[in-house]
């Protein structure tokens, strides 16, 4: 007798999951952690440029602007913004000849 004759083929009504341990707290916790991880990974991939620019430039405080005229403050803001705009960050283009 070959192995092929002993293999059971599932019928359509037997394809449902009948797990007896699906209400186990460890399984529930693992499912929740997995779903949260997937959501965070998707958000990271969608908004990575925005998030990492904010972390790189947004958390750094510049020098104090007390007593500095408004025109110089605006010039400083424009310089900082142009520095952020120039940095596209994570990708390198390599051209082959």
UniProtKB/Swiss-Prot annotation:
* GO BP term (any one): symbiont genome entry into host cell via pore formation in plasma membrane
Which positions bear Phosphoserine?
64, 82
Q: How is this chain's activity regulated? A: The M2 protein from most influenza A strains is inhibited by amantadine and rimantadine, resulting in viral uncoating incapacity. Emergence of amantadine-resistant variants is usually rapid.
Site (Essential for channel activity, possibly by being protonated during channel activation, and by forming the channel gate and the selective filter) residue list: 37
| Stretches in topological domain Virion surface | 1-22
Keywords in alphabetical order, please. Answer: Disulfide bond, Host cell membrane, Host membrane, Host-virus interaction, Hydrogen ion transport, Inhibition of host autophagy by virus, Ion channel, Ion transport, Lipoprotein, Membrane, Palmitate, Phosphoprotein, Signal-anchor, Transmembrane, Transmembrane helix, Transport, Viral ion channel, Virion
Give the protein's function: Forms a proton-selective ion channel that is necessary for the efficient release of the viral genome during virus entry. After attaching to the cell surface, the virion enters the cell by endocytosis. Acidification of the endosome triggers M2 ion channel activity.
Name of the protein this chain belongs to: Matrix protein 2
């Amino acid at each position: 007798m070959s192995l092929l004759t002993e293999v059971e083929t599932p019928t359509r009504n037997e394809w449902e999951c009948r797990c007896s341990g699906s209400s186990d707290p460890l399984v529930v916790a693992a499912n929740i952690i997995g779903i949260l991880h997937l959501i965070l990974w998707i958000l990271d991939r969608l908004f990575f440029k925005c998030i990492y620019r904010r972390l790189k430039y947004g958390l750094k405080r510049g020098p104090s602007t007390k007593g500095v005229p408004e025109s110089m403050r605006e010039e400083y803001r424009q310089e900082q913004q142009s520095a952020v705009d120039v940095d596209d960050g994570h990708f390198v283009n390599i051209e082959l000849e």
